[in-house]
C-alpha cells in the first residue's frame, strides 16, 4: 500500500509549503492545485468556479437565467457542487493509488480514510499568519492592510470549515480527526518538514 500524507491547514499557516517540502524530503508526489485543474477537465467547468466551490465560497459565478425560480437555481448549484465533490473524490483516490504522495486540502483525509493516510493539520496564531501572507506578497494580497488581511484569513478559514464539515460530517481542525497537529508559530517550515520526514 502506498504511503499517503494529507495536510489540512489554516490559511497562512504554511501548510502548503510544509506539504511541498515534505514531498521533496521523502521523494513523494505532491498534489495541490493540480487537483483543481483535473476536476475542471473532468466536469467541464472552469477552474475559477471549481476553486470557488472547493473554498466553500458562495455560488455566484454561474449566471441565473431571468425568470428561473430561486428553487431551481439552488438545485442547479447544489448539483454542480456535488458533481465537483464526486470528481474530486475520484481524482484523489486515483492519485493516491498511483504512488506515495502528499495531498494538500480537498478533504483528502476523509476521502482516503480507508487507505489510512497520515493526517496532518497545520495551524498558527493569527499574527504569524498575517505576517506570512504579507511576506509572500502575492498579487491578490499585496495591497491589503493588516486589518484587511486578517479579515480575509478568517473568512477563508470559515469557508474551508463550512465546506469540510458539510461533506465529511467531521469538524475541520478538530484534533481528534488528525494524527498530527502542528503549530507553526515561531518555527521555520523547512525545519518542521525535516523533523516530520523522519517518521517515514
Question: How should each PLM-predicted stretch be described?
Answer:
Residues 1-10, 99:
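Pre-Walker A (Motif I) flank of P-loop NTPase domains
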Residues 7-20:
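Glycine-rich phosphate-binding P-loop
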Residues 29-41:
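Short beta-strand-centered segment that lines the nucleotide-binding/catalytic pocket of NTP-utilizing
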Residues 114-135, 143-155:
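Conserved phosphate-donor/acceptor-positioning beta-strand/loop module used by diverse small-molecule
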Residues 60-65, 142-189:
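Small-molecule kinase domains that catalyze NTP-dependent phosphoryl transfer to phosphate-bearing small molecules
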Residues 40-100:
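ATP-dependent small-molecule kinase phosphotransfer cores
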Residues 89, 189-197:
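Short, amphipathic alpha-helical "lid/cap" segments that border enzyme active or binding sites
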Amino acid at each position: 500500500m502506498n504511503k499517503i500524507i494529507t495536510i489540512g491547514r489554516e490559511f497562512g499557516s504554511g501548510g502548503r509549503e510544509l506539504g511541498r517540502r515534505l514531498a521533496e524530503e521523502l521523494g513523494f508526489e505532491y498534489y495541490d492545485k493540480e487537483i483543481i485543474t483535473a476536476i475542471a477537465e473532468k466536469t467541464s467547468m472552469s477552474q475559477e468556479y471549481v476553486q470557488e466551490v472547493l473554498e466553500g465560497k458562495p455560488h455566484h459565478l454561474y449566471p441565473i437565467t431571468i425568470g428561473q425560480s430561486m428553487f431551481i437555481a439552488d438545485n442547479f448549484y447544489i448539483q454542480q457542487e456535488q458533481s465537483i465533490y464526486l470528481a474530486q473524490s475520484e481524482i484523489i483516490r486515483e492519485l493516491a493509488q498511483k504512488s506515495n504522495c502528499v495531498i494538500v486540502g480537498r478533504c483528502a483525509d476523509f476521502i482516503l480514510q480507508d487507505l489510512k493516510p497520515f493526517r496532518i493539520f497545520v495551524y498558527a496564531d493569527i499574527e504569524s499568519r498575517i505576517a506570512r501572507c504579507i511576506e509572500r506578497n502575492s498579487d491578490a494580497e499585496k495591497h491589503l492592510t493588516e486589518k484587511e488581511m486578517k479579515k480575509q484569513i478568517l473568512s477563508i478559514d470559515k469557508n474551508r470549515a463550512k465546506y469540510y464539515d458539510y461533506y465529511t460530517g467531521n469538524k475541520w481542525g478538530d484534533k481528534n480527526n488528525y494524527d498530527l497537529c502542528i503549530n507553526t508559530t515561531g518555527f521555520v517550515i523547512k525545519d518542521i518538514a525535516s523533523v516530520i520526514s523522519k517518521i517515514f
